Amino acid sequence: MDLAQALAGYAGWLGHGHADRAAAWVARLGMNAPEIDAFRAAPTPDAPVYQAMPTRVDAPKGVGAGDAHLPTDAIEALRRARQRADLNAFTYLPDRLEPAGRGILAGVPIAVKDLMLVKGMPITAGSHAMDAQVAPRDAEIVARLRRAGAVVIGLANLHEFAYGITSDNPRFGRVVNPAAPSRIPGGSSGGSAAAIAAGIVPLAVGTDTAGSIRVPAACCGIAGFKPSYDALPRDGILDLAFSLDHVGPMGRNVDDCAAMFAAMLDLPAVPKWTRRDLGGVKVARLGGYFEDPLDVEVRVALDAATAAAASDGAQVIARDIEGIELAAAIRLNTISAEATAYHAGRLEERPEGYGEDVRVRLEMGMFLPASWYVKAQRLRRVLADRIEALLREADVLLIPTMRAPARPVGEMRAKIGDRDYALHTAVTDFTGPFNLTGMPAISLPWSRSRDGVPIGLQVVGARGRDWDVLAIAQRLQGASPHARA
């Protein structure tokens, strides 16, 4: 009996009514063969399982507030959104805008990812499997932003149910990358990133399960911040994988993200968070897995950022993380179990409503053993302990956001150096580990390739040290070619 027949038989035993899809399941499992092989070979550690716990964000110790220079014309932003319908950046634009509060984002237009409740707007998650039901209330994070004065001008397009990295949406169309139209905008928060990169809005809300804020930020040449796990409330936001999901700000630069983060924390004002220099800061540049392989132009950008950090007073040290190569396998088993469990009822009732790439990934989750999920959480605990130990030695980690700049539209595999990767692996290799650990991480726009494609770099810190991450990233941003352009 071959694998397809075995899976079909098992699916029938489970009561799954679509055993005829066994060939698609086998093909999808084949795409994850490297992760599955690595996971099987890894011994199960004698360690407790990882527990995703909320994080308290430490107060900033900065010298002054950054000036984000945010525009305040929401009506003009809505007009721009309608004019740029070719980008497919939005799933919904309202006929009229709701007035907001008079806080730190007074009058600032924002886009909200179509994965969360916005009162009076229809939530769809970008899927035909969701009826477009008008939200009766705001998600808590949206309510906080409205209290701070932000004006929601629309719902941003995304990869269906936030489960993918291309933002090629089966219901609302493929999001176009304004910075490089022949390249993917990243996902899953592709519409949020595109709306900022096109100058429609200065700020947007995204979610991040394996890089879904930081990857689109890097692809589109903007900034995207994934805060510490559960530092921000996820009430009123659809889950993908509960222990990996984060919500956070996206903006043109680090200063924008900091202003929006303050509003998301429900602070009355943007606190003093910036630094005069990087004196006394220890930066760990990660090698090994994080540099082999690496696109040549991404390496040049990383070298330049490392030099900039040192010239600004930072002490730069070189470090590796033992066992980091298992991060993708740990994430595969975690997200597959949690996402399939969340979608089980809807998938059974309306399977045809899902796009093929998301449907097959959710179906694949039925076939990964429960024991693998537990093993993954034990391995996750070990990995988190190692990275936490490193962040007691260094203040932040400095790495690229992706191994290479945004990939061409339609590409399913990526050749980087002498290695061939499935697209999702190539894109999330450097972002996914920090969803596993719940650590704050920001992708900042650094430079562009010879072809004009944006290159982003990532700064990562210890849980609760979100403002330190933002402050250090802001100093690096000031030295970047992007800032000088």
Task: Label every model-predicted segment.
Residues 416-428, 432:
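Active-site-proximal gating segment of KS-fold condensing enzymes and close homologs
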Residues 73, 296-319, 344-349, 373-394, ...:
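Acyltransferase
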Residues 201, 394-395:
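Short, high-confidence coil segments that cap the C-terminus of an alpha-helix
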Residues 56-60, 64, 105-125, 280-282, ...:
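Short helix-loop capping/hinge segments that flank enzyme active sites or metal/cofactor-binding pockets
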Residues 3-134, 161-163, 485:
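Short, well-ordered alpha-helical
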Residues 143, 198, 202-291, 303-312, ...:
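Structural helix-boundary/capping segments
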Residues 84, 104-246, 288, 401-420:
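Short glycine/serine-rich loop/turn segments
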Residues 14, 77, 90, 257, ...:
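Residue-level signal for inorganic ion chemistry
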